[in-house]
From Swiss-Prot:
<feature type="compositionally biased region" description="Basic and acidic residues">
    <location>
        <begin position="105"/>
        <end position="127"/>
    </location>
</feature>
<comment type="function">
    <text>Binds together with bS18 to 16S ribosomal RNA.</text>
</comment>
<dbReference type="GO" id="GO:0070181">
    <property type="term" value="F:small ribosomal subunit rRNA binding"/>
</dbReference>
<dbReference type="GO" id="GO:0022627">
    <property type="term" value="C:cytosolic small ribosomal subunit"/>
</dbReference>
<protein>
    <recommendedName>
        <fullName>Small ribosomal subunit protein bS6</fullName>
    </recommendedName>
</protein>
<dbReference type="InterPro" id="IPR035980">
    <property type="entry name" value="Ribosomal_bS6_sf"/>
</dbReference>
<dbReference type="Pfam" id="PF01250">
    <property type="entry name" value="Ribosomal_S6"/>
</dbReference>
<feature type="region of interest" description="Disordered">
    <location>
        <begin position="99"/>
        <end position="135"/>
    </location>
</feature>
<dbReference type="InterPro" id="IPR000529">
    <property type="entry name" value="Ribosomal_bS6"/>
</dbReference>
<keyword id="KW-0694">RNA-binding</keyword>
<comment type="similarity">
    <text>Belongs to the bacterial ribosomal protein bS6 family.</text>
</comment>
<keyword id="KW-0687">Ribonucleoprotein</keyword>
<keyword id="KW-0699">rRNA-binding</keyword>
<dbReference type="InterPro" id="IPR020814">
    <property type="entry name" value="Ribosomal_S6_plastid/chlpt"/>
</dbReference>
<keyword id="KW-0689">Ribosomal protein</keyword>
<dbReference type="GO" id="GO:0003735">
    <property type="term" value="F:structural constituent of ribosome"/>
</dbReference>
<dbReference type="InterPro" id="IPR020815">
    <property type="entry name" value="Ribosomal_bS6_CS"/>
</dbReference>
């Protein structure tokens, strides 16, 4: 059996059905002898660009270990389920169980503005002309 990371986006009008969908997919994996190593519900998030005139979606991440037949069945369900806007399946070398960067608390995530302000202003100004000369 192989390890897979699956992310799928659910139509925002169907957000209340997400727990039932997740239960169905995890049940399908475990019934066929697989395991679910990580399951994260990222909630409703704004999309980078509209998909079919939809600006928000409910995100779910799953890390599973299953056979190819089970994965084909899951992908087939995703393809014919109108509530699922997009899905992505990536094969992994090993099981990933730690929390994803999306689920880490805010204090653990580095802030870009704070990092930028820590550098001296003169250092930032010196880099700009060097970049301009390179072009």
């Amino acid at each position: 059996m192989r390890h897979y990371e699956i992310v799928f986006m659910v139509h925002p009008d169907q957000s209340e059905q997400v727990p039932a969908m997740v239960e169905r997919y995890t049940g399908l994996v475990t019934e066929n002898g697989g395991t679910v190593h990580r399951l994260e519900d990222w909630g409703r998030r704004h999309l980078a660009y509209p998909i079919n005139k939809i600006h928000k979606a409910h995100y779910v991440l799953m890390n599973i270990e299953c056979s190819g037949e089970t994965l084909d069945e899951i992908e087939n369900i995703f393809r014919f389920n109108d509530a699922i806007i997009r899905s992505l399946v990536v094969r992994c070398k090993e099981a990933i169980t730690e929390a994803s960067p999306m689920m880490k608390p805010a204090e653990e995530k580095p802030r870009r503005r704070e990092e930028k302000s820590e550098r001296p202003r003169t250092e930032r100004n010196e880099e700009a002309p060097a970049d301009a000369e390179a072009n």
